[in-house]
Amino acid sequence: MINLKLLESNYENFVSKLRGKNINEDVLKSLLDTFNELKKQRQILEDLQAVQNSKSKELGALARSGGDVAGLKEELSKNKEALGAQNEIVRTLEEKLDNIASNVPNITDDDVPFGRDEEDNVCIKKVLNPREFSFTPKAHYELGEQLGWLDFERGAKISGSRFTILRGEAARLSRALVNYMIDFNSARGFELVNVPFLVNSNTLYGTGQLPKFEDDLYKVRDEDLYLIPTSEVPVTNIYNDEIIDAEILPIKMTCYSACFRQEAGSAGRDTRGMIRQHQFEKVELVSITKPEQSEQILDEMVACASDLLASLGLPHRHMLLCSGDLGFSAAKTIDLEVWLPSQNKYREISSVSNTRDFQARRAKIRFKDGKKNALVNTLNGSSLAVGRTLIAIMENYQRQDGTIEIPSVLKRYM
């Protein structure tokens, strides 16, 4: 959630930055007007409460002295009614404010380029040159079906579209990738954690998936439980509503999980193969930091994911996302895109984001800063998406006869 006090004091800056995320100024004006009205009504409530307290003391003193308390009792009764009505006004405004604020995205960092969509993202680095093939490279789904690695037909029979069964060497390679990624991230100082794949609505609110993106989530019927869209959600919320000792910051964690997404806005996109699935696996990085640490930690997380790709011999590039392509909670995001020979282009395989204090404000994650409590910064990123890494290896390491070479760093994990 954005800082409403900063919105009040720096309104034009918020309007400018959120315009880049396609937020109309009318939304911010409504938010600020509601915030100011709530402050006004809270002051009225406090004044009424002060009167109630004062009159109650006066009544007690008058009763002890044997004076006539009838008139004062009537005043207290009327003031109590006014208090009740004012409480309802404040409660309604608080609900309205939360409804507006919880749907407003994070503002962008100053170095995020203004743009409309992915066409306006900026390439800031390329790592490894794409391989030159002496034959026409096949797509991963062609290779997978020929080798008996990927069973799309039976996956669809069991679960429907956008589900795949990995068999034999593909299943082993996928498991090898998970173990290698965990070991690689752990060696960079990220603590391995294992979390639930089902979380409640408060948890999803904390990281920004609810209420805005409920249509993309799988909900358990008649329960306040959802399947996680990414392990960023439970891992970040490990510290939900906690005050962390500043001495242990930054906290750096890595986590393997299955992820589940409706892909509600992806109809007709990537319908063949494993690029876009309802269920997929990912190894995630999450960091919780002091505000002054988060830019350095973002660089470290990007380097970790990039070095992991490089260790697998996979050509990729770093993309600084423009304002219009940024996620809801992100202030700044670096995407890593891996080269896919069959498509002759780069595709996203990791997205590393700094959310500043946006998620921390929603999830109430604080640290002890001297004598006062302050909000942490939270960061998250894939290191890496397992299925897309499998795809990239299949396509970049394919031989002319349709077999797949296994990257040397993975052989001991197979």
Curated annotation (Swiss-Prot):
| A GO term from the CC aspect | cytoplasm
Q: Name one GO molecular function term.
A: ATP binding
Q: Which UniProt keywords apply?
A: Aminoacyl-tRNA synthetase, ATP-binding, Cytoplasm, Ligase, Nucleotide-binding, Protein biosynthesis
Q: Which residue windows are transmembrane per the record?
A: none
Q: Does the keyword Aminoacyl-tRNA synthetase apply?
A: yes
Q: In which pathway does it act?
A: Aminoacyl-tRNA biosynthesis; selenocysteinyl-tRNA(Sec) biosynthesis; L-seryl-tRNA(Sec) from L-serine and tRNA(Sec): step 1/1
- What does this gene product do? Catalyzes the attachment of serine to tRNA(Ser). Is also able to aminoacylate tRNA(Sec) with serine, to form the misacylated tRNA L-seryl-tRNA(Sec), which will be further converted into selenocysteinyl-tRNA(Sec).
- Return the similarity comment: Belongs to the class-II aminoacyl-tRNA synthetase family. Type-1 seryl-tRNA synthetase subfamily.
Which protein are we looking at? Serine--tRNA ligase
Gene from which the chain derives: serS
